[in-house]
Amino acid sequence: MPDNRRELIKYRLESARERLNSAEVLLASKSYKDSIGRSYYAMFTAVRALLAKDGVDYSKHAGVISYFQREYIKTQKFEKKYSKYLSQAFQIRNNTDYADFFVVSFEDAREQADRAREFLTAIEEFLKAEDIGENK
């Protein structure tokens, strides 16, 4: 794998962790909608690390999600629950950003942050097993 791809993977994983950390900070400050957005972007950016491994990218979120489902869920490289986590996070994030009067509770935001942490960990472990993780 070209070094620039490894660097991109590393960068995207670092960005995903930073976004997850931001989600936790926002959750603690009771900014639940913004926390949900950061949780989604932690997952989305982690998936983009996988795409960097494969040498592909998409300009739209739906393209990234579809690729993940096709190449990583349907091939059973990841459990189906991760497809659900990502799809639901995308939908909830859209609602928090664009829907009027969309109410988010602490529990909603906590669940999304927990799922994002699990999701990111799964991707990091996968990349490490592929000998592509951050320490490579």
Q: Which residues make up each language-model segment?
A:
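Terminal alpha-helical segments
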Residues: M1-K136
